[in-house]
């Protein structure tokens, strides 16, 4: 093996272990967020049984479904990390070369900005093509609120993928794909814009204290997450449609989903669970710290 291959393998392993630990640690927050996002589109949660908010959700889940149910869908989330990272590594430089080759970020800012969005969107869409079914299964398993095996819609990851494929074909595993790609581009635009502005306001960006850099990264991640959150809500709602027939289908398509959520639930509905998403983002910062520590050991 070449030195570059060994270095990649070490990074891949350290990143995977760090991601598995952090994703498992924040899985309960992630499940609360998903339930608040999709409960309106769930066949299992009656209107009078819907969760009133984050605290109500945290209190009721262990009572109604057991403590371990906080980690429903976490395995799919952990597995998803490895192909995503490998694909990002494979495509990232290629897309940067295509969209940003020969562009000077100092003299051609807007071209650099557009190229960054295009390369990020293209890399994200390419990775999503391969890992989207895992993201889909993660959402459906987290939204499954039955306590016993007989009450639950799916027995596990494999059962979820097989049942939906039998019912709707491969297409069923890709519900909400288009809006997911749009969300990636919006997230990158917000992240890139806010981060660039924040860094530009610092007196000496290159010699910024690590705590200040961490706080900026946290703030930027939170702001970008809130900006792109409605797209995440719509895609999760679309995921809930797979496996349904006739009158059970709530939305005719993505545009109809946007319209109905706004009309029936109001603009606030697009941001259900957004606060728990911000808390989960702190777990992302933990990953970076953990990743650096693991690299020292491996």
Swiss-Prot record:
Keyword 4Fe-4S found: no
N6-acetyllysine, modified sites: 105, 268
Family matches, as InterPro entries: ADT_euk_type, Mit_carrier, Mitochondrial_sb/sol_carrier, Mt_carrier_dom_sf
Superkingdom of the source species: Eukaryota
Protein name: ADP/ATP translocase 3
Residues recorded as bearing N6,N6,N6-trimethyllysine in the entry: 52
Cell location: Mitochondrion inner membrane; Membrane
Solcar repeats: 6-98, 111-201, 212-297
One annotated GO biological process: mitochondrial ADP transmembrane transport
Domain comment (free text): The transmembrane helices are not perpendicular to the plane of the membrane, but cross the membrane at an angle. Odd-numbered transmembrane helices exhibit a sharp kink, due to the presence of a conserved proline residue.
Gene that produces this protein: SLC25A6
PTM description: Trimethylated by ANTKMT at Lys-52.
Xref: Gene3D superfamilies: Mitochondrial carrier domain (1.50.40.10)
